[in-house]
């Protein structure tokens, strides 16, 4: 294993996605192996599992490291999102291995919602498939702007550059149409480790970095809202002398003395204290869990948003939004639903579906319902106003 180090490493959250059988789990398992993150006993267990799954074989089946569910191992596919945590000498990683089958697209979307970057796999024999386009569209919808394109199974096409290049060009064109600003492409053969952790001797025509080196060095700026926002998770009232409002800051920063507004609404106050388990802070920023006390009593409940008084979030009880429908039953206009945003849950109705989107062509199509895994642009009506922002500005709100 990699020698322990006390150096502070940056953290990269990424997903592996693409169509079924493109080799996502194998690639991720190989990446863990090449990063030196598999202890000897786990390698021995992997060898036993590989022999059990492939009697008479002599190659490690790296997909078994991440395909944890029995149903997945038996079918040779990924159903659930498998999360792994590992590090190299330069960086720490949280990776979500996402399922490739269309019926599990909602699982993939869940993984993508927490990722800074996507590693999209394409089988060199098949090129771009509908599910490749679907996953790329969802990544773009959820704010992922940098993608690593891994054209896998190059060993099965004799490592030919003239097969790799058209796939790279076609994907780059698709990504540009969806607003993905950077595509880093490389040819790999996950089973043998070509260009995963070490450069491939079979593809001298490729002189770029390996996948591991690319993940270690790529610069990704996560979405960070500039304006202060904190959804209230609970009102902390241990006794009559203390009333605080606890939550995790999802945007910007706040200092003692700053003027805030409670949303939805117009009630204003100033921050008296920023309380944590380690004592009071003079200032707090996005990602920190804190308790705020105010200089006067204000009616605040769970789900309200404490925001910068000079730059509050928009408020409305009607708006339009893109929806990726994850329910087994279809979404129908004017049926009652729950809408959860931040720490608030309220009654909602989709008053109309303006159109649904063909994720393969990005065409807008007429629709009267949304089925599982379909994306639509919908008008939404709420019982009362909420504070909200565009996903690209603040994913929490």
Language-model segments: residues:
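C-terminal effector/interaction modules appended to NTPase cores
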Residues: 2-17, 22-25, 88-89, 239-397
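Residue-level signature of catalytic and energy-coupling elements of molecular machines
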Residues: 21, 27, 46, 76, ...
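Conserved nucleotide-binding/hydrolysis micro-motifs of P-loop NTPases
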Residues: 22, 33-34, 101-102, 125-129, ...
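Alpha-helical scaffold elements adjacent to nucleotide-binding pockets in ATP/GTP-utilizing enzyme cores
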Residues: 27-31, 42-45, 107, 131-138, ...
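Conserved Switch II/interswitch segment of TRAFAC-class P-loop GTPases
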Residues: 91-94, 98-104, 112-136, 142-165
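Canonical P-loop GTPase G-domain recognition
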Residues: 145, 157-227
């Amino acid at each position: 294993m990699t020698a322990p180090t006390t150096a502070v490493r940056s953290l990269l959250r990424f997903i592996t996605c693409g169509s079924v059988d493109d080799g996502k789990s194998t690639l991720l398992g190989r990446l863990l192996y090449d990063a030196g993150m598999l202890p000897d006993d786990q390698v021995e267990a992997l060898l036993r599992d590989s022999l059990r799954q492939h009697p008479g074989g002599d190659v490690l089946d790296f997909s078994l490291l991440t395909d944890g569910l029995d149903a997945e191992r038996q079918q040779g596919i990924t159903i659930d999102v498998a999360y792994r945590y590992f590090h190299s000498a330069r960086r720490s990683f949280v990776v979500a291995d996402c399922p490739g089958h269309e019926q599990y697209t909602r699982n993939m979307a869940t993984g993508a919602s927490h990722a800074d970057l996507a590693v999209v796999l394409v089988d060199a024999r098949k090129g771009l498939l509908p599910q490749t386009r679907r996953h790329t569209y969802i990544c773009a919808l959820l704010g992922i702007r940098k993608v690593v394109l891994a054209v896998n199974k190059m060993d099965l096409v004799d490592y030919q550059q003239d097969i790799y290049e058209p796939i790279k060009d076609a994907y780059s064109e698709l990504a540009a149409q969806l607003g993905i600003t950077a595509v880093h492409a490389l040819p790999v053969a996950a089973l043998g480790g070509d260009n995963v952790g070490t450069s491939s001797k079979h593809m001298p025509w490729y002189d770029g970095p390996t996948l591991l080196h690319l993940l270690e060095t790529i610069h990704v700026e996560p979405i960070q809202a500039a304006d202060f926002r904190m959804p209230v998770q609970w009102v902390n009232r241990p006794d009559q002398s203390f009333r605080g409002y606890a939550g995790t800051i999802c945007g910007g920063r706040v200092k003692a003395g700053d003027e805030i507004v409670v949303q939805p609404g117009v009630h204003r106050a100033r921050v008296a204290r920023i309380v944590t388990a380690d004592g009071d802070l003079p200032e707090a920023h996005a990602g920190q869990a804190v308790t705020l006390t105010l200089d006067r009593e204000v009616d605040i409940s769970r789900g309200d948003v404490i925001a910068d008084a000079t730059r509050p979030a928009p408020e409305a009880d009607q708006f339009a939004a893109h929806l990726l429908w994850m329910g087994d039953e279809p979404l129908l206009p004017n049926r009652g639903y729950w809408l959860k945003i931040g720490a608030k849950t309220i009654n909602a109705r989709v008053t109309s579906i303006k159109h649904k989107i063909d994720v393969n062509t990005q065409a807008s199509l007429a629709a009267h319902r949304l089925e599982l895994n379909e994306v639509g642009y919908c008008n939404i009506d709420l019982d009362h106003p909420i504070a909200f922002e565009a996903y690209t500005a603040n994913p929490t709100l």
